[in-house]
Amino acid sequence: AYPDSKEAQKVGYYKLPVEALSTNYTYPQENGNRHEVRRAAFYDDKMCGFLVSGAPLFDFSAHHYTAQALEEAKHPHEIEYCDELVLNLNWKSAPLGSNSCGPLPEDKLLIKPGDFKFSMNFRGFAGAELDDKTFFTMI
């Protein structure tokens, strides 16, 4: 979701593989942003990874391809995938807007220059250390 489309999204606790966080558009384009996230965990098949939380909330997207690979592809099958996790952690994300077929984004949603205060906390974990309960209490 993005600032101008978040009202259509459900708030909840989700467990999804990275591949499920993307939308397979006919013409590859930026996608998969998660908006106003409280915390997120990223881990491998051995349950080794890290937990991140933001103060205040944060946005993230996670893919197995880089922004450059996405930009260079003209069709989904041309995206060059990688084994690594490509993670974008953001204080805020710009609105989508729809100026090509509708109005500009609302002014209040635009990110404007200025001072801001933001912090992120990271905590590594291994094996069974992370479960549904510790996800909410580890940081």
Language model: regions and residue ranges:
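Beta-strand/loop-rich accessory regions of lumenal/periplasmic or secreted enzymes
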Residues: 1-139
